[in-house]
A protein has these predicted regions:
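Glycan-recognition surfaces
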Residues: 1-66
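Conserved, mostly hydrophobic/aromatic
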Residues: 50, 125, 153
Length: 182
């Protein structure tokens, strides 16, 4: 479902957060690299925001230009992660909204969204800073995991990973995000 023509951050992130309260995430179509979404925020935010819904990609540069290899690598890796890890459970994901109230999220400077597979074997949490974010730490508490299971947690920004129990993730992990709209 094309839920909005507003693809510009930070509103696009807020729309995804809100629409996943009414629709399953695989029915929330999110576009990357089109309809002015390139005007604000990092490419990371646009791509990762789209990964939490039905991801649609547009062109990432003029047809006659050579694509920036860093952009190509990031988009390719992200699409691979989406296809191999998120999309297999997206149509039946349990959705949790750590920041359900847009007004409160704006005051806090960030919004987050958690998707978990029905068998609780995999999940993803996206955290996105808004225009008011001045940089710093954000405490995230998973809500949909199994407390007794152990999960390999991968931090997509730097690729680091660690093993954590569901109980530890539900107590919270801290993410450092240095800037707004990332």
């Amino acid at each position: 479902t094309w839920v909005s023509d507003k693809q510009t951050a930070p509103r696009s992130i807020e729309i995804t957060n809100g629409m996943t309260m009414a629709l399953p995430p695989d029915r929330v179509d999110r576009l990357v690299a089109g309809m002015t979404c390139h005007k604000y925020a990092s490419l990371d935010q646009h791509v990762r925001g789209a990964m939490l819904g039905h991801m649609t990609l547009n062109v990432f540069g003029p047809a006659t230009a050579e694509m920036n290899p860093d952009v190509f690598d990031f988009v390719s890796r992200s699409v691979g992660l989406y296809k191999s890890f998120i999309r297999p459970f997206l149509n039946e994901a349990r959705v949790y909204h750590p920041t359900p109230d847009c007004k409160a999220a704006r005051a806090a400077g960030y919004t987050a969204l958690e998707l978990v597979s029905p068998d609780q074997k995999r999940g993803v949490i996206g955290v996105f800073t808004l225009t008011g974010w001045m940089g710093g730490e954000i405490d995230l508490r998973a809500r949909g995991l199994n407390r007794g299971k152990t999960y390999r947690v991968t931090y997509d920004n730097d690729g680091a990973s660690e093993l954590l129990t569901g109980a530890a993730l539900m107590r919270g992990v801290t993410a450092f995000i240095p800037s707004a709209l990332s």
